[in-house]
């Protein structure tokens, strides 16, 4: 399957981020190894976030054939030091694995995810 991708919208209170909305966007690369978000979809998502009083928290994408950790390309393309980068691995479709990372200067650090 192709990688899925999108934006994460929510609220921030210090280091605590609460996800309120996920915006699934078109992967214009149509690839199982890469993704690029449709710029028009990104703009629409950010406008919707503003209308709802939430802020962009980061982005998400899937790894259909690899673990849920940032690839070298993911690290290289991580331009926002404040963003959360969520990756879901679907290598085992029966047990998907979701992880979130902050990436600064090509170094990734896993963030805790709390489901409420």
Model-derived regions: residue spans:
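Conserved beta-strand-loop surface patch within small alpha/beta domains used
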Residues: 1-56, 65-116
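Conserved, mostly hydrophobic/aromatic
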Residues: 59
């Amino acid at each position: 399957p192709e990688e899925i991708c999108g934006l994460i919208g929510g609220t921030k209170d210090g280091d605590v981020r609460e996800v309120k909305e996920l915006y699934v966007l078109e992967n214009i690369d149509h690839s199982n190894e890469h993704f690029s978000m449709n710029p028009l979809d990104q703009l629409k998502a950010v406008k919707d976030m503003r209308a709802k009083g939430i802020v962009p928290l980061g982005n998400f994408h899937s790894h259909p054939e690899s673990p849920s950790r940032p690839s070298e390309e993911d690290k290289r393309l991580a331009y926002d030091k404040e963003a959360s980068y969520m990756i879901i691995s679907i290598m085992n479709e029966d047990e998907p694995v979701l992880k979130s990372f902050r990436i600064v200067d090509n170094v990734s650090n896993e963030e805790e995810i709390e489901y409420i």
